[in-house]
Amino acid sequence: DNKELYVNLFTASTLDWTDTGLKLAQETNYPEEETSTISITAAPKSAVTFRIRIPAWSKGAKIEVNGKAIDGVTAGEYATVAGSWKVGDKIVVTIPLQLRTESTDDRKDIQTLFYGPTVLNALNPSTKFIQRGFYERNGLDGTIKLGVQKKEGTKNYFIIDGDEFEPAYNGDNTPYHMYFQRKDEYVGFAGKLTDVLNPKRPAAQDRSESTLMDDIWAGAPFKDRAAFIKKVQEVTKTYQDE
């Protein structure tokens, strides 16, 4: 209807929308950087509403129009940016890049490591699943923050427990693992494992098999340490009662 423009991908590009007169340029190095700037290079004949996709995995995404933040930026939805546009107007989208894991559909213990939208492969020649634990590395927002270092002089390369993780798009011939097996035998927080076993809750009709740590971190993000401790106490009591 020449009134709405959907932005689904953050990639360096230009648009010449002849029917409306709108021209724009998107400048970005995403996903190696977390911002994308959309600049109006020719004004449309009438108002155009931008619908900007905010990835479901994102935390803390924001959009600024000419330096002013807008409301209604929600993960997993399209943010609405409406207005009458002139040459030089800028929309800056910021999607913080954070480490996280995602499980396969059929097994929670088989996971992949992501940095923002980027799959990270572990460079390792083993012919068996490598095992890694990540819950003890989580920050309050549920993303991985502890016990991880970026490889010096690189972007999107990380070192974890001696293994180098690189973007899947790198595409060289080094043996790698795209999936790893989660190692979660013990409870761990704030970068440290304890000697307390991480109990499992068997699968039931209304849920898949899970562990104490699974159920605690299902409540992330936590607004503060008190909210996190409260969740730990609630979940622990549930396991004790069962």
Stretch-by-stretch model annotation:
Residues D1-S39, T74, G83, T94-Y186:
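C-terminal beta-rich recognition modules with glycine/proline-rich loops and embedded aromatic residues
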Residues A47-V65:
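Beta-strand-rich binding/interaction modules
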Residues I38-S46:
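Extracellular and analogous surface-interaction loops
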Residues I63-D71, G116:
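Short strand-turn-strand beta-turns centered on an Asx-Gly dipeptide
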Residues Y78-T80:
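Short, surface-exposed beta-strand/beta-hairpin micro-motifs centered on an aromatic residue
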